Amino acid sequence: LGKLVPHGLKNASRDPATLEAWWRSCPRGGVGILPGPEVLVLDFDDPEAWEGLRQEHPALEAAPRQRTPKGGRHVFLRLPEGVRLSASVRAIPGVDLRGMGRAYVVAAPTRLKDGRTYTWEAPLTPPEELPPVPQALLLKLLPPPPPPRPSWGAVGTASPKRLQALLQAYAAQV
């Protein structure tokens, strides 16, 4: 469908008539899904990463997921309200973060030129029916807290002589 959406997500549509026209025009086109901001898609490029995380978080097995042509997985989960993750987070080797209203996912029944396909292993559900991201997994994906800020004393707690000495010391370094 690249020729139908030359600007990618900017040309995306949810309009049934538009989608129907695209399918008539290009019946072998691929499918892309842009999940909303409340949907996290774990993109496992490495089948071993999927197996490891699935064993660590058995709840992932109940999530809607598809198998990719290279043997990876796309696992669809619901983020807690107000939680924002960065797609650039690389907290888990072999796993990319997609969806979240910012990154699309190629989806079944897309077929590659070599004949390999995307296939659903567990069917996709509406966002409100997706299982939540397991808490322990979410903690791995959240950015680290900012470093503590230095706590300065309240105004008026340093003597004028101390402030003058600090200013002179800083001025001498400049």
Language model feature labels by segment:
Residues A169-A172:
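A mid-sequence, solvent-exposed acidic-amphipathic segment
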